[in-house]
Amino acid sequence: MRLLTLALLVAGSLAYKFEDCEQKPAALNQVLRVGAKLYSYNLDFFYQKALPYNAIYAFTDVFLQTNLTNADQYQFYQGTNCTTVQQLYDNDNRYFGILRKAALLRSHQLNPFNDTIVGVSTTEPYEISVLIWKVNYFRVGVYVGAIVLFLLASKLVRNVVFYYTSGCSFGLLASLLLVAFIVWRVAPKKTIGVPILIGGWSVSLYMLHFAWSNLQSIMIEYQKYVIGYFATVLLISMAVCYKRGPPTDARSHDIAQWTLQLVALALIYFSVQMVEVSTGTIGALIIQQICRGFLFAGIRWYFVGLKAVWRKFFPARRRLLNEEEYEEQAEKTTKEQLAQLREYCKKEGNRPWKIAGNVRSARRLARFIEGEDDHITEDEIYAHELTGDVLDDEDYDFNEDYGLRTPNESHFDLEDDEDGAEEWDEVVVRRRASEYGRDSVQSVRVPRSVSSRLLSPYQGQNHMNRSLGPGIGFRRDSTPRHGNFQSEHRPRMPRTEQIYRSRRVEYDVKNGRVEGPSSSTASGMTPSEYMRKARRIDATSKTPTRKSRHPTESEDADE
């Protein structure tokens, strides 16, 4: 009973649709064959059922196919019912067919979401069918390309390549009017010029249709002329674009951008079969264009916050640098910072006279800025190695009964070092330390044979600064000292043993002088003189310091 009711409903609906038809149209669900006729006064009606109105068919196309290749042999019409199709046929055949619509304007494409009635008028036998493309990739390509064109319009209008490409393409299409324009200029205006001017675009459209219909034969038969035509038009278009040049003002860019975006929106609208999909896409693009700054900023800050929360709860492990990587990075960073310092000093607005007034040697600063010298000299490198990381525990002579105390009251002991057969003297270096905010004192031992020659300017003084023991000891002297020097206290040893075992000379880094005893009247040596003398002595001794690879000319002269 239910099946009978459903069949009656379907039959009633079909009868209602085809009530204006003399006979029921044939369904185009398969290939249909129609025989020849003597007269084409009557139309052959066919029926195409609509597809479901669903978004999956947004890029679907339905095409009508016949085996009649000559457009003059048949006429076809399409509409929503038989009455509409018959009316179109009657309008074309009035006045003996003078006002008949051109075959170029008749489309073989059917609306996939509407029930379509097709009428065919011909005297020839023919076959008719329907081809359904569920996904027309040409439509998909136009849709995606239009979206990309809309989003990149602001960048494309400022691109020189796009300017020349679009200009040449427009020139190639517009060149079809060249022949009509030349004829209009040469021919008499009253007889030929005005009709050509009025029908110029119609002639161009006809030429396009003719060329597209016979493209293959034209390319084969007139190959040289086609290549010459394209080459000439492209060269002329490129020359015109080169002469005018790309637009530079902001308003021209805005007009070009808006034009491209309007073209993109039109392509989106006509590339989709469903109006809802195309309208939604157009609305989303317009909203994105208006709220571009707020939208992108919100999305970016959302992901930044999400990344920060993730790093907080799941922090990444830090890989520590090994010694080679540390040295490589330190060397690279030092070079970069020194280059930045040179560039900063070379700038005119940085008051170079003020910078030179804040340094001890303006000449040395100038040589550093010009790249003639490094930021440190060989003497300073030698002094660093003499008093810094070159010194090991065995370079110091400590008694096992004594320990050192730092300003924060922490103790540390060093290994014992037994004196060899040769006696040693110590050289004390004073510098400002950043760890405790005070002046620090550091000493290095040298053999007695070296120190005797190194301290030769002070041999005649009776108030040589003696140490209190065989090691790195600092004495509490009744003579008042200037500055907050770090001091360590150790028990006194017999005076004779002190004098016999070790002596000490002080090198003050802050003042840049090697000073003798406080009561000495001898003039001190500069750090350069002191280091040059120490290197000369070091070359012939067993002093555990670095030897100079390239002796300077001043050293050779002193030797």
From Swiss-Prot:
Listed under GO cellular component are:
nuclear envelope; nuclear inner membrane
Describe its function.
Contributes to nuclear envelope stiffness in germ cells. Required for fertility.
Gene name, Swiss-Prot/TrEMBL? nemp-1
Tell me the compartments it is located in.
Nucleus inner membrane
> What family does the database annotate?
Belongs to the NEMP family.
Q: Which InterPro entries match?
A: NEMP_fam (IPR019358)
Q: How does it sit in the membrane?
A: Multi-pass membrane protein
Which terms are listed as keywords in the entry?
Answer: Glycoprotein, Membrane, Nucleus, Signal, Transmembrane, Transmembrane helix
Q: Which residues are glycosylated?
A: N67, N81, N114, N408, N465
Domain of life of the organism in this record? Answer: Eukaryota
TM stretches of this protein = 164-184, 192-212, 218-238, 267-287, 290-310
Where mainly found?
A: nucleus
Record's signal peptide: 1-15
What this protein is called in its record is Nuclear envelope integral membrane protein
Q: Where is the composition biased (Polar residues)?
A: 517-526
State the species of origin.
Caenorhabditis elegans
| Biased amino acid composition, Basic and acidic residues | 530-539
A Pfam family of this chain? NEMP
| Segments of this protein annotated with the region Disordered | 475-494, 510-559
